[in-house]
């Protein structure tokens, strides 16, 4: 696999660190008044999901991670595995609970997700940035109840709970940002 110099570091670059594939989240080049320049890098370990901060000397090289990212459609969950399908080859890839992680609450059948494969096994599932889900449970919004403008909690069809504005009702479909878990808008049908 290719090696990357610290000058090539950027967000999203996949590197090997401590024998585990990692993704660079943030890279900051630091030039102190005295001494050698260095890079302060935040990396997310793709298997464990932990975010750690590492320091690399300027010019140091790091091994690139041999990972593959595929765009696959989510099919179904059989209780143990979440099954995804390649729309071109129709090959199915099962992912376990560890790979799916927090993405479970945003998975909707037929949505295209990004799977990260390492040594042929899925290690990370990333749902689409925005999903449209139906509200299955929420408190009724009472007229004039605007003392706390934070909205109200709503349970979605996947089991996820998000804060929504008071005017949103049960049965409505809303658009949610999966990166932050926040309500974006109502969806008109």
Curated annotation (Swiss-Prot):
The gene is efp. One of its GO terms (molecular function) is translation elongation factor activity. One of its GO terms (cellular component) is cytoplasm. Keywords: Cytoplasm, Elongation factor, Hydroxylation, Protein biosynthesis. This is Elongation factor P. It comes from the Bacteria. Pathway: Protein biosynthesis; polypeptide chain elongation. It comes from Idiomarina loihiensis (strain ATCC BAA-735 / DSM 15497 / L2-TR). Involved in peptide bond synthesis. Alleviates ribosome stalling that occurs when 3 or more consecutive Pro residues or the sequence PPG is present in a protein, possibly by augmenting the peptidyl transferase activity of the ribosome. Modification of Lys-34 is required for alleviation. May be beta-lysylated on the epsilon-amino group of Lys-34 by the combined action of EpmA and EpmB, and then hydroxylated on the C5 position of the same residue by EpmC (if this protein is present). Lysylation is critical for the stimulatory effect of EF-P on peptide-bond formation. The lysylation moiety may extend toward the peptidyltransferase center and stabilize the terminal 3-CCA end of the tRNA. Hydroxylation of the C5 position on Lys-34 may allow additional potential stabilizing hydrogen-bond interactions with the P-tRNA. GO terms for biological process: peptide biosynthetic process. The keyword Phosphoprotein does not apply.
